[in-house]
Curated annotation (Swiss-Prot):
This is Pregnancy-specific beta-1-glycoprotein 11. Gene3D superfamilies: Immunoglobulins. It comes from Homo sapiens. Belongs to the immunoglobulin superfamily. CEA family. The keyword Acyltransferase does not apply. CDD domains: IgC2_CEACAM5-like, IgI_hCEACAM_2_4_6_like, IgV_CEACAM_D1. Residues 1-34 form the signal peptide. The gene is PSG11.
Amino acid sequence: MGPLSAPPCTEHIKWKGLLLTALLLNFWNLPTTAQVMIEAQPPKVSEGKDVLLLVHNLPQNLTGYIWYKGQIRDLYHYITSYVVDGQIIIYGPAYSGRETVYSNASLLIQNVTREDAGSYTLHIIKRGDGTRGVTGYFTFTLYLETPKPSISSSNLNPREAMETVILTCNPETPDASYLWWMNGQSLPMTHRMQLSETNRTLFLFGVTKYTAGPYECEIWNSGSASRSDPVTLNLLHGPDLPRIFPSVTSYYSGENLDLSCFANSNPPAQYSWTINGKFQLSGQKLFIPQITPKHNGLYACSARNSATGEESSTSLTIRVIAPPGLGTFAFNNPT
């Protein structure tokens, strides 16, 4: 068997991305000393680039060969053929204008698109006894390298336990499968989750802090896989019951009263203070210098979340007493 002739102009092809996986099939009644093989150059090619299907170990004394799109060898799937005698190239209905067949049976596909993914069949015809040719078939499958996916969300800011969120893995990729990850692990399905039939869409019912993410999606096929960047839902919640610091309730007359209020909330809560039911100020802190018994009373802090519309409050009873040694008179008659 003579050496394989190199296809012309292959040195000008720039390679990247799209994976081709070859499934070798035995040739029917085709006696050869070596198995005909096909090599994808490059092994990976991205959409818009070129790929060469380089054929090795061609038998001698060939009449010609035909390339088909798919595994059905009919006129509709006929791409192109090469007739050895006369070096004639014939194009069929499946020819897109981007395919070039060479004298060594190799096929160049330029500007690869997603429609190019799938099976291809090479039909080799060997000279027989002058009346019949001996044929053989070689089929391989071309897989598009999966693009890096991204996650879109129907609502990135859901209210806790109240709203449903729909996450979608993009783009929609033919002949690909979808996987989901949460917190870096395979998705732990719960009664609050549901996947679409294709697994491309994830439904989250009544999102809680345990199901807020981060989420990742992965697109994979038999040739490659790619995972998205993580997406974490900004869960709107609260406010929880506020806490007043310090929780001291007794003060000496003349001390400063310096109170702070905090409630767990997203977004951060808005605070207001009342003393004995009367509004005092807005803000997280309440400061009164040199308090006296007239400042005795019920100090209440209210926290409100404008995003959830929820409000919560807590209170503290403050009692101001005379400093040690001044006695009851000083307490009842402050100066």
